[in-house]
Amino acid sequence: MIENQSDNIDIKENDVLNQDNAPEDNSSAAEKTIENDELSPQKTEEINTEELKNTISNNDARLEQLEKEHETLKNQYVRISADFDNFRKRQSRDQDDLKVQLVSKTLTAILPIVDNFERARQQLKPESEEAQALHRSYQGLYKQLVEVLKQQGVSPMRVVGQQFDPNLHEAVLREPSEEFKEDLIVEELQRGYHLEGKVLRHALVKVSMGHGQQNSQEEVEKDTVEEDIDSEENTSEDV
């Protein structure tokens, strides 16, 4: 009985001691929690700042990469656009050249007919009324041909008295002339034509050798004659 009471007293003392110690433990835990609460915002801020720096750095790198890609695509677009524009111009130019070639071929085939009409007009001198009527008839056809040529952009060359130009003219004959200086065209043997500023057919012409060339030629002939005479005289003396 006495022992039981003693045990109860011991238990109560232990409870009292535990109660005395409990506030101290709770206070220590609370202090640790407060310290953790005070350090947490600073650490969080440091972590957030580092993450933000990394994010900004990654975004800058991505932006730089996108700018490079944009510049590359822009250059490709400009180059493709320029190539397409050049292709379009080249196609248009080729079509124009082909058109000119086809028109030139057709008109060149017509020009000999025009030449025949012009020669006939110069040579024929109709006297009777019937001949004059026929002359007027084919001259009307000639005028129609000339008008068609004009509508197609064909224009005749005017060459007499002009400086000889191998790009425009073809020299068939050369002869001395007192009227025309050297390399001037004396006569048109076959008319030349332009088509839209380009040569459709070269003019066949006679070109002057100049007055000096005539004198030189006469002197050469005179020297040749004198040499022949001297040769004959020497032959006679030998005989």
Curated annotation (Swiss-Prot):
Location of this chain's protein in the cell: Cytoplasm
Gene Ontology cellular component terms for the protein in this record: cytoplasm
Keyword presence, Nucleotide-binding: no
GO biological process assignments: protein folding
Keyword Cytoplasm: yes
Top-level lineage group: Bacteria
SUPFAM superfamilies named in the record: Coiled-coil domain of nucleotide exchange factor GrpE (SSF58014), Head domain of nucleotide exchange factor GrpE (SSF51064)
Chain ranges passing through the membrane: none
Primary localization: cytoplasm
Molecular function GO terms recorded: adenyl-nucleotide exchange factor activity; protein homodimerization activity; protein-folding chaperone binding; unfolded protein binding
Bias type Acidic residues, positions: 218-239
Region (Disordered): 1-50, 209-239
UniProt entry keywords in alphabetical sequence: Chaperone, Cytoplasm, Stress response
Biased composition, class Polar residues, residue ranges: 16-30
Assembly description: Homodimer.
Role: Participates actively in the response to hyperosmotic and heat shock by preventing the aggregation of stress-denatured proteins, in association with DnaK and GrpE. It is the nucleotide exchange factor for DnaK and may function as a thermosensor. Unfolded proteins bind initially to DnaJ; upon interaction with the DnaJ-bound protein, DnaK hydrolyzes its bound ATP, resulting in the formation of a stable complex. GrpE releases ADP from DnaK; ATP binding to DnaK triggers the release of the substrate protein, thus completing the reaction cycle.
Annotated NCBIfam families: PRK14140.1, PRK14143.1
Family assignment from sequence similarity: Belongs to the GrpE family.
Classification via PANTHER family: GRPE PROTEIN, GRPE PROTEIN HOMOLOG, MITOCHONDRIAL
Protein name, as recorded: Protein GrpE
Originating organism: Prochlorococcus marinus (strain MIT 9312)
Gene behind this protein: grpE
